[in-house]
Every structure is written in C-alpha cells, then in structure tokens.
Amino acid sequence: MTDTTILPRPEVSGDFLVAALYHFARLPRFESLREQLFELCQKNGVKGTLLLAAEGINGTIAGPDAGVQAVLSFLRAQPEFAALEHKESRASHMPFVRLKVKLKKEIVTMGVPDIDPNRIVGTYVDPRDWNALISDPDTIVIDTRNDYETAIGVFKGAVDPQTKTFREFPDWVKNNPGLHNKPKIAMYCTGGIRCEKATAFMKEQGFDEVYHLKGGILKYLEEVPEEESLWEGACFVFDERVSVVHGLAEGDHQLCHACRNPITPDVRLSPKFEEGVSCPSCYDERSEDDRQRFRDRQQQIELAKTRGERHLGR
C-alpha cells in the first residue's frame, strides 16, 4: 500500500487540539479520499496519521482547533462517516513530527480474514457503566493492547495477554480455553478500535456475551472522576506526549528512542539509561556497536535542536 507524507515545519509553541478517531464502515472508495484528506490537513496545519482501508478509517491528528475541526467536518460530510465519533484532548506542543495519510489493508491489523465489525460486533458499554461490569465476578476483563502499553497502566483485575502486536491476539485467545469459564467477556483498548475488532473475532469464536468499552480508556479517563476510577497507572498514547492520565492531562512518561518503550522519570536515574541510547528494558539486548550508532544519532538530534529544527530520525 502507499502513503503520503510531509516533512515537518519548525515547531510552534502553543496549545494544540488532539483528536483520536476511528470508524468501521464499508468504504470501497477509500483510495480516492487520500489526496483530499492530505491536502486538507496540510492547508489547516494539521499533523498526525490517518489510515484508510476498505473497512473504514483510523488515526490521530493534532493542530489548531479550527484546523482539526475542519478535518472532522470533512470526514462527517462523507456518507460512510456521518456517525464518526472522536475523542479530544490537549497538548502543550505539537505532538506529531509529520503528516501521514496511508492506504492499508486493515485500519487495525489483526490478520484474520473475514473478521468484519460492520457485520458482527460486541456490545458497547459506556464509561460510566464500565466499573459495574468489570467488578462483576462473572466477567473476565481483557486488555487488547500490546505489552509496552500495559506496562504503564491497566484496569484493576484485567488479564494482560502480553502480546507484542495485535496480530498475536487471535492465537492467544485460541490457546486460552479457560476464557470460556465465565459467561461475560469485557475488553478494552486505548480508543476503542482494537477491542471493537477483537469483539468481532470473539463472537466468531463462539463467545456469546462480549462487551467493549465505548471510546476506550481515553473516554473513561475523560468522563470518570479519579476518585471513582478503577484505572491504575497511565495510558500510553501514540504521539509525543507518550502518556495521559485522568482528565487526559499529559503524563510524565517519555520514550526510550532506542527501543520505543515508555519510561518513567525514575528509570532515567538507572545507570542503564542513556538519552537516546538505552534504558533498562533494552540495555542488555544491544551491542556496543548498536549503542554507538544510537549515540551518533542522538548527537544529530541535539545539533538539530540547537538550530531550532526537528530531527526526522527521532
């Protein structure tokens, strides 16, 4: 598949609107939307990533309020996306380096043929009703995200499949027959797209009562007061904020730019941490040649900063 990218302009400080969105819809004309979307985003100072496929759209964008709203209005003007929902949060700086509009086989890659959330899917649960469902002893709660995401935050009592990618989730389900031991399955993810597709897969596997958190963790953190919350930790996000917490405030995590895992301020105190080079999670997996290569890259990043530029390798 192809993609369209734009090199970054110099970063401008300020308050940016971030919109996370997805919508499953039958979209045979998805290829024809790419250039229109790219040009509209570019015109309005919007960056981020949008994925288009025959099954719908997925992505996160950021920019000036008016620019992001212009993109959302364009999408909802398309008949297939009239019911598009999105989650909003704020960023103190532009959280994306570039703009990408990609054409894909799937808007979230599971790799299982004929799984179609447009045909069969689980039952939505609103954030305000989520606590009651996951506290029910007849419910198995499953986190459908990847291991580096679950490492910094999960719902209390959730099963963590420890998957490296979403492609591993179907095999994990098939290898865990104990999931049939309770009548209810409740699943969640960052914004709702992975758990929605996962419910379609679970229904195909014969699970009956399958539920998923509407709007994902992001909507839960936005709507449920912290004092009532069953969420523990921070929520990983796929932009330069790295994580958000209750109220969708920016968290204190950063990325290790060697392994792309999130790290806390405490981890930065480890002797195995070196900015842009290593962290405790990846130090023992790298050779000294690897670390030297990362040091050279980090030096280029620092030089770019002194010139007020962004280094694309980051």
From Swiss-Prot:
Spell out the family assignment given in the record's similarity comment. Answer: Belongs to the TrhO family.
Instruction: Tell me which PANTHER family the record gives.
Output: RHODANESE-LIKE DOMAIN-CONTAINING PROTEIN 7-RELATED (PTHR43268:SF3), THIOSULFATE SULFURTRANSFERASE/RHODANESE-LIKE DOMAIN-CONTAINING PROTEIN 2 (PTHR43268)
- Output the GO biological process annotations, alphabetical, semicolon-separated: tRNA modification
Say yes or no: keyword tRNA processing present.
yes
Residues of the Rhodanese domain = 135-229
Designated name of the protein: tRNA uridine(34) hydroxylase
Q: Which keywords are on file for this protein?
A: Oxidoreductase, tRNA processing
State the HAMAP family in the record. TrhO
Query: CDD domains, alphabetically?
Result: RHOD_YceA
Against SUPFAM superfamilies, the record matches this protein to: Rhodanese/Cell cycle control phosphatase
Q: Which superkingdom?
A: Bacteria
Name of the top EC class for this enzyme: oxidoreductase
> Which organism's genome codes for this protein?
Agrobacterium fabrum (strain C58 / ATCC 33970)
Name of the encoding gene: trhO
GO MF annotation list: oxidoreductase activity, acting on paired donors, with incorporation or reduction of molecular oxygen
Which Enzyme Commission number(s) are listed? 1.14.-.-
Gene3D superfamilies according to UniProt: 3.30.70.100, Rhodanese-like domain
Q: What does this protein do?
A: Catalyzes oxygen-dependent 5-hydroxyuridine (ho5U) modification at position 34 in tRNAs.
* Catalytic reaction equation(s): uridine(34) in tRNA + AH2 + O2 = 5-hydroxyuridine(34) in tRNA + A + H2O
Catalytic residues at: 189
